[in-house]
Amino acid sequence: MELPRQKRIYSSLETRFTDFDSLTQELKERELTGLVRLTFDACEGIIIFDKGRITDGYEIYGDEMPVKDRRGRNTRERSRIEPGKIDVYELPREILQIFIMTLRERPTQTLHTMYTDFRKLLNFYVDRKLYGTLEVKTSQGKGYVLLDAGKPVDVFFCNKCGSEALNELLNVVDQEDVEMDIYSREGGVR
């Protein structure tokens, strides 16, 4: 799964050489707001931190919906017995909250670029100051546009983020038919 990657703190730490409890303690002392991604052969685990506290966790198996992993308990246990990689990202709180909402929800609508213009859809969200996430499924993977009051607060696609990811996503959407899942909600993330 593609994740927001504002500021990478650690990359590709191996679980067999990393004491996850010590890493968690360090992130607590740093008062991390962001996420820890653990990648294993069978699944990915995402552990959410808010001001140094573990607040949530999810396990993702392939392209399936994320499965709730209360405070990352299963993921932390798996890190002790299975080889895997650990990545740690610091994120602005608003981006983290929008991303968490997307993990928790099912899409409210699915559209296809065969019938819908992606740029017009983005402009519609901006004009109406809507909140939500656009998940774009391409041949190169999934891309995400996180919107707060219509403003794209983050875009991530193909290991890129921000305007670079948006430009790459727009190029791909121009060249192929893609499916878009829309996660929209009333109000904001405050």
Where in this protein do the model-derived segments appear?
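Acidic, Ser/Thr/Pro-enriched low-complexity segments and adjacent helix/loop capping patches
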Residues: 1-190
